[in-house]
Amino acid sequence: MIFTAPAYAPALPSPLPLQQTIGDFCLAKRRERQGASDSLFIEAAIDRKWTIDDIEARLGRMAAALSSAWNITPGQKWHKTVAILASNCVDTLILSWAVHRIGGGCLMLQPTSSADEMAAHMDRVPPFAMFLSQDLLTLGQEAFQKSSLSSNVPFYSFSGAEAPKPQQTAVPVASQDAPNISTLDDLMATGKELPLLEKTSFSEGEASRRVAYYCTTSGTSGFQRVVAITHENIIASILQAGLFIEATKGPASEVTLAFLPFNHIYGLLITHTFTWRGDSTVVHSGFNMMEILISIGKHRINTLYLVPPIINALSRNASILDRFDMSSVRYIVNGGGPLPKEAFLKMKAARPDWQIIPGWGQTEGCGIGSLSSPKDIFPGSSGVLLPGVRIRLRDDDGRIVQGLEEMGEIEIESPSGLFGYVDYADEALLSPPKEEEFWWPTGDVGLFRISPNGEQHLFIVDRIRDMIKVKGNQVAPGQIEDHLTKHAAVAETAVIGIADEVAGERALAFIVRESSHAREMSEADLRKIIQEHNDLELPEVCRLQDRIIFVDELPKSASGKILKRELRKQVATWSPPQK
């Protein structure tokens, strides 16, 4: 059985508009929608407003400066990549669009990755140049030193929206291979008098092959992978999300927040979609709860795009929200991971006037595969499929699931879907032929269920790699996690499987205690209470017994996903607590 978008979802244009680069595509639509004087971006830290004229002028000069500095002949098909390691700022977007205009692609490095991980990414996608925000210069230099890149790679720094603090100044690397660092402003100054380049016009099929971004997966269950994302992938995803939002919420533009990292596909995609929609976007360098809450009232933010850990934090600290002006907020959209029903209900209880809109997506699917309509919210689900997305489910025996309420691995087919992984020792770049159907196995386990409104909703059960096999039974960690968070003493939890001589595997829970309920209780007493809460109410295969570890925090990726691979490392030498 193949699942598709609901009847009310609009169709994608056919053929897709693939003549322009991503930035030019978004800016052209923006200019159609609103006047040039409207604020396209607002950088929160310095309260700087950017109009579309400002953006296009800087984009044109930056592309000309890059072309001149790197001796690129106008019209030449330049097929190189630059690496960008930066906190959120408008220049990060403009820089990537300028690189696209001269024919290049961008390797988006995540600051939460280790220097070793970034070095491995750069070895797989060797950059022609590196651009680093001031606060990440030292980390970028360390990653460079650990890579096999030659010392002639040019380095450029830029300050972003916030002036660099003294301690953010680059620390010289003690090596003869240490790079010389220029600034983006110096580069721009050289291009002030240069003639502007013509905008890129893709030939037929070129946008399907031309890589715009290399983004890394979160690596929640294993190592990070580098995904090649084309201009077609991004443009298709913008249209899928943007047209669905217009059909379900209306075409009116909004004021939105961009604090999710631009180097992660979720933050990158929604910011492009905001631009295409005509929204005004308030850019924050990262997530700081107090600064975000102030910004919501100051800029009258309408919709918050969040990840489950932030939603959990807001629901646990609902009293803090009352100290700020939240009257403009109408919607919160969840992405970056499934939002369990219990977390949904906690947030709804904290702010009953907010519509909570769950969604689902992956880096390999270029961001968003499903989303909810405000008129069809189904707690615990990840929404309905977006236009052009098709999903089938494959069960443990390799058969395609033929009905509702049956679990299977999600396989997806979409114009926004995977172009390829970059070469690994055991896996070559995968580039499926576009003229054939290509179903990508996502590694997520899901099922479909009918909502009260009669629509097919996708429910994410768990990651295949995270499923726990107890006495031959497949146990979803999410089932245990959802139940544990119902207990007042549990703030956050993550469940993994560990080896067991009798059952094969058993569940083990990492738990962050809720400070208002549990700090005064001993770990032994609290462990007993939580164990009884879980083991007396869930099936035997879900029992924890004494396999509970209390931690101050859970390791997370830049997008807020819990890194279970790090938790598995911690239990390599674990033994049950003494009784």
UniProtKB/Swiss-Prot annotation:
Record-listed E.C. numbers: 6.2.1.-
Residues annotated to bind ATP: 217-225, 358-363, 444, 463, 561
MF terms (GO), sorted A to Z: ATP binding; CoA-ligase activity
Region (SBD1): 288-358
Keyword Iron: no
Comment field on protein domains: Both substrate-binding domains (SBD1 and SBD2) are involved in the substrate recognition, and are sufficient to confer the substrate specificity.
Similarity comment text for this entry: Belongs to the ATP-dependent AMP-binding enzyme family.
UniProt name for this protein: Acyl-CoA ligase FPSE_09184
Organism: Fusarium pseudograminearum (strain CS3096) (Wheat and barley crown-rot fungus)
Organism classification: Eukaryota, Fungi, Dikarya, Ascomycota, Pezizomycotina
